[in-house]
Amino acid sequence: MSSYLFTSESVSEGHPDKIADQISDAVLDEILKQDPKARVACETYVKTGMALVGGEITTSAWVDIENLTRKVICDIGYEHSEMGFDGHSCAVLNAIGKQSADINQGVDRENPLDQGAGDQGIMFGYATNETDVLMPAAITYAHRLMEKQAEVRKSGKLAWLRPDAKSQVTLKYEDNKIVGVDAVVLSTQHSEEVSQKDLHEGVMEEIIKPVLPTEWLSKETKFFINPTGRFVIGGPMGDCGLTGRKIIVDTYGGAARHGGGAFSGKDPSKVDRSAAYAARYVAKNIVAAGLADRCEIQLSYAIGVADPTSIMVETFGTGKVANELLVSLVREFFDLRPYGLIKMLDLIQPIYRETAAYGHFGREQFPWEKVDRAEDLRIAAGLK
């Protein structure tokens, strides 16, 4: 019997890097509302007392960058100096330029279907049947812990909670099946006055226990709640934040490979983002069709070229049909040209700020989480 541990982490919406991601995607959303053909690559940097918004944007839209940035920061919960960061009074610097004309000529075409990829690169998508959302369990529950932290903070149930937090979940596997939670780490920013006893009890009873399956917890499960003992200084006062620095948190928690490209602040012409969403869509439909228990897709592109330069399917020995057949089915049922996948997944809409915390995958409200091709794939593969 093979036994092993696997761990994934998540961070809260108030983590400095996630503040930056949410600002970048809020800018993207506001632009897409006005200009569906915009080219956006928006980067944000946050540190004590300031937010710098920069990048390359070509659009006919007008967005009040300063007020939008302040709103995102305040919505997260950084509303007064007691938090160490205040959206009302921080400096907001704007360093946005236009997208290079050299890139434009490779992307834009008279026929939209000939639209070239905005850059070269490799993208991965993954799905597994170990959770109902066809995502790896460790990252799924790490995200849910962070969502619960925000919920009890914003509701006032645990009034001493502050926005910055991190979680980590270690699962124990036997013969590739989850048998329990080995360890949980949860660190959360808090107010000065709360005692360690109240903090530990509140986190355990209001965040951890309501989220993790009781059958996975045992007397052997280890809990590390604020293991340094103090986490008052947090957010951008504790660490600077930068767009695109939580790419493993954003995807599969290390359970699958990653092409290296970040998502937030990029419009759908950037295949770093849109093709990674399409790869998840393909992998999820293959698993939902029962063609594999686990599936990883790799796509690659060349700048200015429409068709993918490669498509790879890996099923880790769990496939019900040959991987070569799956590649053929992917080519038949999914249009993976940049414009094709944008249309297939309806990506020109202002949905991106919501993706920028708690993971881009495994959340059913997003169009790349649909399993509407599963039945067609199953029939075409010859499975009953």
From Swiss-Prot:
L-methionine binds at E56, Q99, D239, K270. One of its GO terms (cellular component) is cytoplasm. Binds 2 divalent ions per subunit. Binds 1 potassium ion per subunit. CDD domains: S-AdoMet_synt (cd18079). Mg(2+) binds at D17. Its EC number is 2.5.1.6. Belongs to the AdoMet synthase family. This is S-adenosylmethionine synthase. It comes from Haemophilus influenzae (strain 86-028NP).
